[in-house]
Amino acid sequence: MPKGEGKVIAQNKKARHDYFIEETYEAGLVLQGTEIKSIRNGRVNLKDSFAKVEKGEVFLHNMHISPYEQGNRYNHDPLRTRKLLLHRREINKLIGYTKEQGYTLVPLKLYIKNGFAKVELGVAKGKKKYDKREDMKRKEAQREIERAFRERQKI
């Protein structure tokens, strides 16, 4: 997401830990009336969600949007499948990626941009356990370097 755009509502931090993100896309969401109100209140969970290309359209599965408190009988199903709005070229690229072995579509963050709810969708490849361990070692080494650097600046 470029600078100065949108208010981030929810992030899928686990996705960056579990997957290598190859490419990202911005997609709009088709929502029902009370869903956008719940999103603006920050009542969204992207943890187990994923996207699939079905019949030339992209759908987001398992994204939990809590029912709106004042919504009474007009409330929505929290885990319903939601359509994503993308350009035809982008959908064709995503179809090409998902046909390849091991690629999946993962929502990385949900944000409001110009009054519309948007999802940052990542084309991802799963990490193996040893890849995750390498990342943890690299981060720990970086922390040690920064800590040593701060100690030297104090002297």
From Swiss-Prot:
One of its GO terms (molecular function) is RNA binding. This is SsrA-binding protein. It comes from Geobacillus thermodenitrificans (strain NG80-2). PROSITE patterns: SSRP. Required for rescue of stalled ribosomes mediated by trans-translation. Binds to transfer-messenger RNA (tmRNA), required for stable association of tmRNA with ribosomes. tmRNA and SmpB together mimic tRNA shape, replacing the anticodon stem-loop with SmpB. tmRNA is encoded by the ssrA gene; the 2 termini fold to resemble tRNA(Ala) and it encodes a 'tag peptide', a short internal open reading frame. During trans-translation Ala-aminoacylated tmRNA acts like a tRNA, entering the A-site of stalled ribosomes, displacing the stalled mRNA. GO terms for biological process: trans-translation. It is found in: Cytoplasm. Keywords: Cytoplasm, RNA-binding. The keyword Iron does not apply. One of its GO terms (cellular component) is cytosol. InterPro entries: SmpB, SsrA-bd_prot, SsrA-bd_prot_CS. Belongs to the SmpB family. The keyword RNA-binding applies.
